[in-house]
């Protein structure tokens, strides 16, 4: 008898719930009229962001390091190219102190005689990117500096002395 009563109450409850009206969804808020207001930089008008970033990214074997970039014509041209898409190229060891590879495009160069340090990202001959894990003195255009932990960690990241790597540059 109790079981029959419980089934009856449950059935009545289910039927009652089926007859409830759909929940009322409040109106979505109206967009504010921004006429005459200053643009705070948060609109999505579709305009391309042309501010110069402070860093780009270098990815090797699925691991990424930031590169603090210089403010020069080469980096401006590189960032402009990276706004379109990332750039992937092959780099190989050279001289026991660097990985070098052709970028696949020419960048403006402003070569000066410099002594590189581990972590430097350098433009060579206008179209090659050099990633240093040692030092060298030559006439280069500085792109930036990889932000890394220890020298040993940088060498592992770049697979120093282990031949060809695939490098991806991105924003």
Could you describe each region identified by the protein language model?
Residues 54-96:
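N-terminal secretory signal peptides
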Residues 8, 13-51:
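Bacterial Sec-dependent N-terminal signal peptides
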Residues 35-51, 78, 111-113, 119-122, ...:
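Short linear motifs in intrinsically disordered
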Residues 8-13, 62, 66, 96, ...:
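Preference for short coil/turn "hinge" residues that link or interrupt alpha-helices
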Residues 1-8:
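Sec-dependent signal peptide recognition
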Residues 86-171:
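Glycine-rich active-site loops that engage anionic ligands at enzyme catalytic sites
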Residues 42-61, 100-102:
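Short, charged N-terminal helix-start/capping segments
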């Amino acid at each position: 008898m109790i079981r029959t009563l419980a089934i009856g109450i449950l059935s009545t409850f289910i039927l009652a719930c089926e007859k409830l009206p759909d929940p009322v969804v409040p109106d979505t808020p109206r967009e504010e009229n921004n006429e005459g207001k200053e643009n705070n930089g948060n609109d999505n008008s579709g305009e391309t962001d042309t501010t110069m970033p402070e860093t780009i990214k270098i990815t090797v074997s699925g691991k990424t390091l930031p590169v603090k970039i210089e403010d020069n014509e080469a980096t401006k041209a590189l960032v402009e190219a990276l706004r379109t898409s990332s750039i992937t190229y092959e780099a190989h060891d050279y001289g026991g102190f660097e990985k070098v590879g052709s970028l696949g495009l020419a960048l403006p160069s402003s070569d000066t005689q410099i002594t590189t340090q581990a972590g430097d990202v350098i433009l060579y001959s206008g179209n090659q990117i050099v990633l240093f894990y040692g030092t060298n003195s030559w006439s280069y255009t500085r792109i930036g500096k990889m932000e890394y932990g220890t020298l040993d960690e940088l060498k592992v990241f770049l697979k120093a002395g282990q031949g060809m790597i695939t490098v991806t540059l991105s924003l």
